């Protein structure tokens, strides 16, 4: 099979997602009800968000493909950063020199750098450089992501789970947003 490339970023191929399932006899198979190639949603003018999977319950109901039906519905109307009681798996392609707005989400986000080097910057001014394979655990903090390269795209994968509202010294922090969207819309993590 030929390598599928993004026209805007030829160094990053279009990601695929393969969903396993069971046939009528209980044998493990690949589900073919949804195309493997992940569609891209352009956010903030240029960055691309690929919704790899999403669930709305925990534990996840795998009976009668309930989770696949739920995920399929999100392909036409993407979920927000997190889903109440569920999970969101997303691949984010960050343009050269791209930077999100400073934002806070009521979620815990596990982010892994797949390509490039990405800065994770906190509102305190602290920052870390994440290189390929590095992991960030973002715990509802005010933060932004920045691609360190001005010539190459960066790619991260995020698993996002809903979190309880954060309270510090009796005050609720709430979900402060970035990218011009609220916590229930498809913004970055």
UniProtKB/Swiss-Prot annotation:
CDD domains: cupin_BLL6423-like
Annotated disulfide bonds: none
Entry keywords, A to Z: Virulence
Name of the protein in its database record: Phomopsin biosynthesis cluster protein C'
Stored InterPro entries: Cupin_2, OryJ/VirC-like, RmlC-like_jellyroll, RmlC_Cupin_sf
Family per record: Belongs to the oryJ family.
SUPFAM superfamilies to which the protein is assigned, alphabetical: RmlC-like cupins
Keyword NADP applies: no
Source organism of the structure: Diaporthe leptostromiformis
Role according to the record: Part of the gene cluster that mediates the biosynthesis of the phomopsins, a group of hexapeptide mycotoxins which infects lupins and causes lupinosis disease in livestock. The role of phomC' within the phomopsins biosynthesis pathway has still to be determined. The pathway starts with the processing of the precursor phomA by several endopeptidases including kexin proteases as well as the cluster-specific S41 family peptidase phomP1 and the oligopeptidase phomG to produce 10 identical copies of the hexapeptide Tyr-Val-Ile-Pro-Ile-Asp.
Cited Gene3D superfamilies: Jelly Rolls (2.60.120.10)
């Amino acid at each position: 099979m030929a390598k599928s490339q993004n026209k805007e970023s030829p160094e990053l191929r279009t990601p695929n997602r393969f969903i396993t399932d069971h046939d009528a006899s209980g044998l493990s198979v690949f589900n073919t009800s949804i195309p493997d190639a992940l569609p891209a949603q352009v956010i903030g003018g240029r960055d691309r968000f690929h919704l790899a999977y999403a669930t709305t319950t925990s534990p996840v109901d795998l009976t009668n493909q309930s989770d696949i039906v739920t995920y399929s519905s999100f392909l036409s109307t993407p979920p927000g950063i997190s889903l109440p009681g569920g999970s969101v798996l997303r691949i984010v392609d960050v343009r050269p020199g791209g930077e999100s707005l400073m934002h806070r989400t009521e979620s815990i986000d596990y982010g892994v750098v797949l390509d490039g080097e990405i800065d994770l910057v906190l509102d305190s001014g602290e920052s870390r450089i994440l290189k390929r394979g590095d992991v960030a655990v973002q715990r509802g903090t005010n933060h932004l992501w920045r691609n360190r390269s001005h010539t190459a795209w960066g790619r991260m994968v995020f698993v996002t789970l809903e979190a309880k509202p954060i309270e510090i010294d009796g005050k609720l922090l709430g979900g402060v947003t970035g990218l011009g969207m609220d916590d229930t819309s498809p913004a970055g993590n």
